[in-house]
Amino acid sequence: IIRDFAPDVVIGFGGYVSGPVLQEAAKLHIPCCIHEQNAYPGITNKQLAKQVDRVMLTVEDAAKHLDCKNEPTVTGLPVRGELLNKSKKSAREELSVPDGKYLVLSFGGSLGAAPLNDSMFDILLRHADDGSVYHIHSVGTNGAEYLDKFVEKGFERVSDTVVRKATVEVRKYIDNMDVCMAAADLVVGRAGASS
């Protein structure tokens, strides 16, 4: 596949699938690079660092854990521009959050995080009952059963992926993270490479 596609460069981000692809590309003398998002690199990037032409890091400390063929470059973490350029005022208008109301955004990454979902369940029920704050929570793609639990507690099913009650919205996945992040007064999330 690599030979047929003939890429100009191959870039990996540490997933186990990137290992064999980058190893084969390196054998074919195709320029290869990896990007490590974490302070402590995973196994795949540790192995590839010795073979690739360029290693890019989010944080400088990661270099201590890598045996790089060439000097690594600290690039930081590439972030979509819309995450940085949205105004709080326009984001809150887009989400219909009134001025003076507090907005909490909570999520456990794209797949979700069961401990966070479990912890947030009672908090979200309380916020929905008292209407004191606006709250958007994502259960993640692996947390769809939580939507049914909220419906059992009186939430309205807006769609297959969204339930709502009063000032609380629970989503399977947040497609407009740029808007939600810009509008939020408080973000509760698990530690992840890009969150």
Residue ranges and their predicted role:
Residues 1, 75-78, 141-146:
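Conserved nucleotide-sugar phosphate-binding/catalytic loop shared by glycosyltransferases and other
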Residues 26-89:
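Active-site-proximal region of nucleotide-activated glycan assembly enzymes
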Residues 10, 186-187, 194:
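Hydrophobic acceptor-binding patch used for acceptor engagement in glycosyltransferases
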Residues 14, 58-60, 192:
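Helix N-cap/beta->alpha junction signal
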Residues 15-17, 39, 110-111, 115, ...:
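Residue-level detector of alpha-helix initiation sites
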Residues 1-11, 18-33, 46-51:
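Glycosyltransferases and closely related glycan-assembly transferases
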Residues 88-90, 97-189:
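Donor-nucleotide binding loops and adjacent catalytic segments primarily
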